[in-house]
Amino acid sequence: MAQSIRSGHLLVVDRKRRSGLIILKEFHAEFAGPGAAVGGLFDEDCQAVIIIGDSCLMLPESPDERQEAYKIRRQWIRLAQQFTDHSLPTERARMILNQFEIYFDQDTIARVPDAAFAQLVGVLPNTIRLSRRSLHKPSLKVRTQAD
């Protein structure tokens, strides 16, 4: 998949599937969700790709479709930027995990390496690991005498 993205051809993540790509670059990562442009000039520096869900890449069929795909890619980048605007690393980690849990099932998210999420929001992989644990701790019910 990384070779396809680095080929220089503009491709589009299939907008009809609940899927996407985490595109790993040297010092950061970017998420491209359904309908987003990948490849072309955007991703010449792609080092690896993590496929989320049942992802499929397609060639844009028209200039309008290319334009729309660029717009969608920018929207995904802006969403990640909103998370990185928070100064606390734990908050950034929690936000990216919450966002992915809204869109993807728990099993899919569990397969994404901590390092990939970390590169999306500029935190250490250990911060993601700790946030995953705190998000999925079972809540303890305190018994009172009335119970």
Regions from the PLM with identified roles:
Residues 27-33, 88, 126, 130:
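Short, well-structured alpha-helical interface segments that form or flank functional binding sites
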